Amino acid sequence: MTLPAFKAYDIRGRVPDELNEDLARRIGVALAAQLDQGPVVLGHDVRLASPALQEALSAGLRASGREVIDIGLCGTEEVYFQTDHLKAAGGVMVTASHNPMDYNGMKLVREQARPISSDTGLFAIRDTVAADTAAAGEPTAAEHSRTDKTAYLEHLLSYVDRSTLKPLKLVVNAGNGGAGLIVDLLAPHLPFEFVRVFHEPDGNFPNGIPNPLLPENRDATAKAVKEHGADFGIAWDGDFDRCFFFDHTGRFIEGYYLVGLLAQAILAKQPGGKVVHDPRLTWNTVEMVEDAGGIPVLCKSGHAFIKEKMRSENAVYGGEMSAHHYFREFAYADSGMIPWLLIAELVSQSGRSLADLVEARMQKFPCSGEINFKVDDAKAAVARVMAHYGDQSPELDYTDGISADFGQWRFNLRSSNTEPLLRLNVETRGDAALLETRTQEISNLLRG
């Protein structure tokens, strides 16, 4: 039995061909064997197939004697939070996040919301399922419904001093995913006026798959910000583990510039802390962390690597340019809710707009944003780039792919962990023309 839905970090595949209720039940049995003793937290996103997949997963776990805590429709971060908060043995979020309509998936964690990835149990689960030894009898253990979100909401609100918050007007675009439910629960505790876009959870995704990284999905948020004169806008993906920002002009803010901003917000509350960041774009983050008295720590991109590094370094915050933001007190997990609360606090306390907070940083360290290339031979494409620049003797780093630092500009080139792509990021020290030249130059080399 081949199981293509098992990826390096999670399970993702087409329903029902690559992921279905029979497989979900078997995954439940196999997962039970991987976890320490204790209950397992389960939750699901808005996709139409998600409740049935969760039910089958639960049946497999309970047939293996595992108590299940069902937290129902939620965001991925809620499974992380409740797994840690309830001291459960593990947790599973049934979600395909921003994948196409016919997909579904699972994100798995063990105790303390520690990720279960390929080399920490996920492929062992796959092999058990594939060997067909994960058959299960009737469920014997209990399932409890726990939909009370009070502890989670209180934790989110603990990141900001509500007495300093101004009555900002915020556009919130849940993309018909799950974020709107949490915004509505937070709203009574905050002085903000919310303009709600695509707010109702709807697994049919009538307004398209919620993936704000796609330029065509940004228009609705940008337009609403401008039409309503909002202070800024926030858009989430389907399971709201990532959030994306738009300034008061409707301009999309690259996730890179949010990392430094959020680092400063956290370091103001936890001085001298370590901040973990990825190698794709670094100069702005390193400077802002050091200016705030923090210690930057470089780490390979990907949530499993970032979380592991944060734990080993006791880092207060971790940020990736891909809009994943991790917080120590949040079980070292990523949250799509904490960042916008911190940015709203920053805007309130500083009296400056989001645009103003990032503009100087964008000028000082302009970046290309991530550019993807489909290439037939990735090694040959990378070799062409390195041969072209080899005589310039760049400082090289291999933390994640290849990072080459030329003093006034740098690039990072890496293979995707999940797709057959090369990903390029370029940044310069305040030179937009050089950025354009080098980005075009490398793009041509990669295309051969």
Curated annotation (Swiss-Prot):
Belongs to the phosphohexose mutase family. Its EC number is 5.4.2.2, 5.4.2.8. Coiled coil: none annotated. InterPro entries: A-D-PHexomutase_a/b/a-I, A-D-PHexomutase_a/b/a-I/II/III, A-D-PHexomutase_a/b/a-II, A-D-PHexomutase_a/b/a-III, A-D-PHexomutase_C, A-D-PHexomutase_C_sf, A-D-PHexomutase_CS, Alpha-D-phosphohexomutase_SF. GO terms for biological process: GDP-mannose biosynthetic process; lipopolysaccharide biosynthetic process. The keyword Phosphoprotein applies. It catalyses: alpha-D-glucose 1-phosphate = alpha-D-glucose 6-phosphate; alpha-D-mannose 1-phosphate = D-mannose 6-phosphate. SUPFAM superfamilies: Phosphoglucomutase, C-terminal domain, Phosphoglucomutase, first 3 domains. The keyword Phosphoprotein applies. The active site is at 97 (phosphoserine intermediate). This is Phosphohexose mutases. Involved in xanthan production. One of its GO terms (molecular function) is magnesium ion binding. It holds the Pfam family PGM_PMM_III. It comes from Xanthomonas campestris pv. campestris (strain ATCC 33913 / DSM 3586 / NCPPB 528 / LMG 568 / P 25). Binds 1 Mg(2+) ion per subunit. It comes from the Bacteria. Mg(2+) binds at residues 97, 237, 239, 241. It is an enzyme of class 5 (isomerase). Its cofactor is Mg(2+). Keywords: Exopolysaccharide synthesis, Isomerase, Lipopolysaccharide biosynthesis, Magnesium, Metal-binding, Phosphoprotein. Pathway: Nucleotide-sugar biosynthesis; GDP-alpha-D-mannose biosynthesis; alpha-D-mannose 1-phosphate from D-fructose 6-phosphate: step 2/2.
